[in-house]
């Protein structure tokens, strides 16, 4: 009977430590040391929350850059069902999806002969990636410039200004946060002469 009592005491003790004390301590420290990140890296414009730096969102208008496709079900970029599509590279369904996406992107961007960057036609592992490659942004630049009646050089400079470099070259490739890039677009004057 003594072993049962000590087991229950140990269970209660570990539950309080790992289920209450540790989460409260971790949350409190993160709120003190990293408040922006602890709150989800929410991006605000004019006092309104417009999204998170960490979660992609759909942009369908021609005046905006588009992100990677979402692999989530129900609706795009659904954080409750994040995860990859789990389709193998040899799966014909994935092949058909990629072909369909390539055709849609070529039509939407009026780029019938230019290769479509792979990150515009494949979802990330989480299905929620907010970043695209500089090549993916360049692929869309002419469409965005035309839709906004801006010179292409203005859009190309904005792309360069929004490239985020990894801390070291072996830790990843340069990326662009689509939400930040689109907000920077919205902050440009409507026409530049």
Curated annotation (Swiss-Prot):
Presence of the UniProt keyword Transport in the record: yes
Keyword set, alphabetical order: ATP-binding, Cell inner membrane, Cell membrane, Ion transport, Membrane, Nucleotide-binding, Potassium, Potassium transport, Transmembrane, Transmembrane helix, Transport
Membrane topology classification: Single-pass membrane protein
Residues that span the membrane, as ranges: 8-28
Molecular function as annotated in GO: ATP binding; P-type potassium transmembrane transporter activity
Main location per the UniProt record: membrane
InterPro entries, A to Z: KdpC (IPR003820)
Coiled-coil parts of chain: none
Annotated Gene Ontology cellular component terms: plasma membrane
Top-rank taxon: Bacteria
Family: Belongs to the KdpC family.
Role according to the record: Part of the high-affinity ATP-driven potassium transport (or Kdp) system, which catalyzes the hydrolysis of ATP coupled with the electrogenic transport of potassium into the cytoplasm. This subunit acts as a catalytic chaperone that increases the ATP-binding affinity of the ATP-hydrolyzing subunit KdpB by the formation of a transient KdpB/KdpC/ATP ternary complex.
HAMAP family per UniProt: KdpC
Quaternary structure and partners: The system is composed of three essential subunits: KdpA, KdpB and KdpC.
Protein name: Potassium-transporting ATPase KdpC subunit
Organism for this UniProt entry: Photorhabdus laumondii subsp. laumondii (strain DSM 15139 / CIP 105565 / TT01)
